[in-house]
A protein has these predicted regions:
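Cytosolic regulatory regions of ion transport systems
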Residues: 1-170
Length: 170
């Protein structure tokens, strides 16, 4: 049950935190940990701000998605996972029997609409493609989804998210 904060971005400055470093609101944290522990962090981000989150749409079927889906369904949440790769969908079907798994492309607006993105309480984008994560998160925010958590690897995109007012990304 651990993770490491590797770097902290504050404005245009980057810090490698030590034991005395103090994190302040607005800092961008770069963390590393096991898939299981990162899943726990995302679950905490979902439940921290919105205690009434009951339905979640996950975009992407990675190992983190499997851990997160199982944690969320075990706590009584309704979870829909959209994954493009059929093989990954098969793993999700096998390991996450309480979730609804959809084999499809999340960049397809009609699929998101068909699967009820406008009715969920939270959207978590966990694909390997920053641009898909970014666009789906921006779209879900624009239609009123209460909580959006976005996986972003590219530092420039994470700065953009901050400037656009998105609070939660990993």
């Amino acid at each position: 049950n651990s993770f490491i904060i590797c770097a902290v971005c504050r404005g245009d400055d980057v810090f490698i935190p030590n034991g005395d470093f103090i994190i302040i609101p607005g800092d961008i944290l770069h963390i590393t940990g096991s898939h299981h522990d990162l899943g726990k962090i995302v679950k905490e981000l979902i439940s921290k701000k919105s205690t009434n989150v009951k339905s979640i749409m996950l975009i992407g079927g990675s190992r983190i998605s499997i851990y997160l889906t199982n944690m969320l369904t075990a706590s009584g949440k309704d979870v829909v996972v959209i994954e493009k790769n059929k093989r990954n969908c098969d793993k999700l079907y096998e390991h996450c029997p309480k979730a609804t798994v959809i084999n499809g492309d999340a960049s397809d607006y009609s699929l998101l609409a068909e699967e009820g993105i406008d009715k969920v309480d939270a959207v978590v984008t966990l694909t390997d493609t920053d641009e898909v994560n970014f666009l789906v998160s921006m779209y879900s925010e624009s239609i009123g989804v209460k909580k959006n958590i976005t996986k972003i690897n590219n530092q420039n995109l994470s700065r953009m998210l901050t400037k656009m007012g998105m609070e939660s990304y990993v």
